[in-house]
Amino acid sequence: MWTYISWQGKHRFLALTEKFTTGAPGYVETAHFEPAEVDPKTLERIKDVVTKSLDALGIEYGASHSELKVDEAGNIGIIEIGGRMGGDCIGSDLVELTTGYDFLEAVIDIALGKEPKEYERREQYAAVRFILTKDDMDIYERIKKNNPELIIKEDVHEISGDPVTQSGDRSGYFIIAGNDKEQIRKYLPD
């Protein structure tokens, strides 16, 4: 998933998010990780596709959230180009944690007719993991016990035991962040 901010028709790439799901049939999102890894050539090709798509759709101001798929042959398919912030803690939390850019402030500034501020980019790793199962809860408890400094935000509830077939069935989430990519990635779904 690709996050951009636009001002006067100029599109600034902010973040690339890796998405984890349950797979078919529901594709319920289980986690997101930033920054996602992609080779530099593919990164530039996708930036070009997203920028041209934003132009074609007439998106000149504000946030945008784009979902694309790159197949094994390198073909890029557009799933969604939306004039909105990414949900599930992407726009509200992960972008700022991984880049240092106050995305929410920028969106508000643009809505008020003010140019968004420049920023000094920082590199950090962050993830949101959703609670769907007892295993997810066990991972949350293990982090809370052994690495509580990684937890940035949490909203965790008792697991109902019912199958999770949509995002609204999840029993909460926790956000972790740090400078060690592998330390964050090890808490993501396989």
Locations of the language-model features?
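Generic structural signal for well-ordered, non-membrane alpha-helical segments
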Residues: 39, 43-46, 100, 181-184
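Peripheral (often C-terminal) accessory segments that flank ATP-dependent C-N-forming ligase machineries
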Residues: 106-190
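Pre-DFG segment of protein kinase catalytic domains
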Residues: 78-80
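Internal nucleotide-binding/catalytic subdomain
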Residues: 1-76
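A broadly conserved detector of short glycine/acidic/proline-rich loop/turn motifs that flank catalytic sites
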Residues: 6, 17-18, 82-83, 133-135, ...
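Short, flexible turn/loop "capping" segments at secondary-structure junctions
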Residues: 26-27, 87, 164-169
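Short helix/loop capping segments that flank catalytic or ligand/cofactor-binding pockets
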Residues: 24-25, 89, 185
